[in-house]
Amino acid sequence: MSHLTDLPPWAALLVCGLMLVGAATTLIGSLGLLRLPDFYARLHAPTIATSGGTILLCLASILCFAVLQSRWVFHEVLIIFFVTVTTPVTLMLLGQATLYRDRFEEQQGVPRKQKPAPGEE
């Protein structure tokens, strides 16, 4: 027997909406990771879309279990905290490491470390 039958209709609609939007946002972030042309563009998809989708899914879980059990769910709050803190920091470090490598290899299209002097452009 599922406890979800005890969920009030207003909460069920809100949980369903949050889950659908969160799943769609996560899917868009994952597709962006696959479809974007280069590494630097691919960094934005998991940072923004996948993190946002995960947060929406956790909010749906918080709402569902808070209504069913009449208590706050702490695990999802920790997940939201760690996703919002670790994902951007990790991808920023990956981006900086890739930029350093590309500058070291002198690849075309990589921005310079410093602005060029006035006659050097």
From Swiss-Prot:
Pfam families: PhaG_MnhG_YufB (PF03334). It is a multi-pass membrane protein. The chain crosses the membrane at residues 10-32, 45-67, 72-94. Keywords: Antiport, Cell membrane, Hydrogen ion transport, Ion transport, Membrane, Potassium, Potassium transport, Transmembrane, Transmembrane helix, Transport. GO terms for molecular function: sodium:proton antiporter activity. Its main location: membrane. It is found in: Cell membrane. InterPro entries: PhaG_MnhG_YufB. One of its GO terms (cellular component) is plasma membrane. GO terms for biological process: potassium ion transport. NCBIfam families: CPA3_mnhG_phaG. Belongs to the CPA3 antiporters (TC 2.A.63) subunit G family. Part of a K(+) efflux system which is required for the adaptation of R.meliloti to alkaline pH as well as for the infection process during symbiotic nodule development. This is Probable K(+)/H(+) antiporter subunit G. It comes from Rhizobium meliloti (strain 1021).
